[in-house]
């Protein structure tokens, strides 16, 4: 009777014990990668140049976020995220301050899976 190869058994255990990242963890990670200082700057530029109201500015924010998300993860994974986000309402939503008629985006509101992120938390 031969003894089992311990090395193979250990490797199999390691592979079996590895768990994939939860979609919540992936959303948090991706949101932090997408919403950067540059991203917020571009949204604020749009707000000032086009004199957007809060509804238009929120729409612009989400369109830009989704375009960056699609570019970053590809269409298959993007569909998975948008389906999940639509079901659970986890899209990051902007926080705006109104400065005498023009909006400034200072960060994003927390959602079920995404922590609040402020402009000053982001790397310039």
UniProtKB/Swiss-Prot annotation:
GO terms for cellular component: host cell mitochondrion. GO terms for biological process: symbiont-mediated perturbation of host apoptosis; symbiont-mediated suppression of host cytoplasmic pattern recognition receptor signaling pathway via inhibition of IRF3 activity; symbiont-mediated suppression of host cytoplasmic pattern recognition receptor signaling pathway via inhibition of IRF7 activity; symbiont-mediated suppression of host cytoplasmic pattern recognition receptor signaling pathway via inhibition of RIG-I activity; symbiont-mediated suppression of host cytoplasmic pattern recognition receptor signaling pathway via inhibition of TBK1 activity; symbiont-mediated suppression of host JAK-STAT cascade via inhibition of STAT2 activity; symbiont-mediated suppression of host toll-like receptor signaling pathway; symbiont-mediated suppression of host type I interferon-mediated signaling pathway. It holds the Pfam family RSV_NS2. The gene is 1B. Its main location: host cell. Keywords: Host mitochondrion, Host-virus interaction, Inhibition of host innate immune response by virus, Inhibition of host interferon signaling pathway by virus, Inhibition of host IRF3 by virus, Inhibition of host IRF7 by virus, Inhibition of host RIG-I by virus, Inhibition of host RLR pathway by virus, Inhibition of host STAT2 by virus, Inhibition of host TBK1 by virus, Inhibition of host TLR pathway by virus, Interferon antiviral system evasion, Modulation of host cell apoptosis by virus, Viral immunoevasion. The DNLP motif has IFN suppressive functions like binding to host MAP1B. Belongs to the pneumovirus non-structural protein 2 family. It is found in: Host mitochondrion. The keyword Ribosomal protein does not apply. It comes from Ovine respiratory syncytial virus (strain WSU 83-1578) (ORSV). Monomer (instable). Homomultimer. Heteromultimer with NS1. Interacts with host RIGI (via N-terminus); this interaction prevents host signaling pathway involved in interferon production. Interacts with host MAP1B/microtubule-associated protein 1B. A motif (DLNP) lies at residues 121-124. This is Non-structural protein 2. Plays a major role in antagonizing the type I IFN-mediated antiviral response. Acts cooperatively with NS1 to repress activation and nuclear translocation of host IFN-regulatory factor IRF3. Interacts with the host cytoplasmic sensor of viral nucleic acids RIGI and prevents the interaction with its downstream partner MAVS. Together with NS2, participates in the proteasomal degradation of host STAT2, IRF3, IRF7, TBK1 and RIGI through a NS-degradasome involving CUL2 and Elongin-C. The degradasome requires an intact mitochondrial MAVS. Induces host SOCS1 expression.
